[in-house]
Amino acid sequence: MLSFAFVYAASMIGLFFVVLTSVIVYLAAKKIEKVDDDRKKKILLLSMGGCLFILIFLKYLSGLPIFTDRNLLIFGNEMSLQSVIKKYLIPIGMSYYTLQVISYLLDVYWGRMEAEQDYWKVLLFTCYFPQLVQGPISKYSELAPELFKEHKLDWKNIKYGVQLMFWGFFKKMLIADRIGIYVNAIFHDSVTPYGLTAWIGLVFYGIQLYCDFSGGIDVIRGASECFGIGLKENFRQPYFSLSLGEFWRRWHTQRKQIGLLKNFK
């Protein structure tokens, strides 16, 4: 219920699109299990297309002139149709949960797991609130056992979760945001850095980027831990990598799973 309330509070109408996406995925996954290979692929493509269409239409096609040039009167204020869509229709975390449910569909299609028979579990997987803001993008086989196991109030989990959140806030607010001031000064539009200044700027930017992303993920993981639900670690000290491939694996460990989409044939 907390996840539904979170999505509803962020966008009342947006909750409808979350439910619509989860219904498409739930029905498609069940159907994929029951049909032959040719029909499986058609159902997969149609369901993926439906989910992506909702995402692309609300987030990107709303920028077309047909939406930006038309105004509506909302609560006494005149707003462009594009502004109405962005403010009232787009669900929070739409890009994240769309990629997440597509990974679930692909796992069912490839036979890596059985389709979930309980719709409410699919819906909760779609809109579990801590990861909607910044990820991480989780596979159903990894997140479902954490979501649907029996949960009890555990002060150890709460203590660990709060510590993780404080560590995340420290990295994001006291390191990333502070270093960002110097990075902006070095790479200001009217300034072209050279030599040592440019190298210092690049190093500072790398630290800022890492602390910003990893700090945000730590806050999310910490909030989830308070409920006894563990989320996968998304950053594993990438700057200690010995190769570019290892750097990529350590930098965004969950995003590499979404790269499987590129291998679909």
Predicted features, each with a name:
Residues 1-265:
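Membrane-embedded transmembrane alpha-helical bundles that form the catalytic cores
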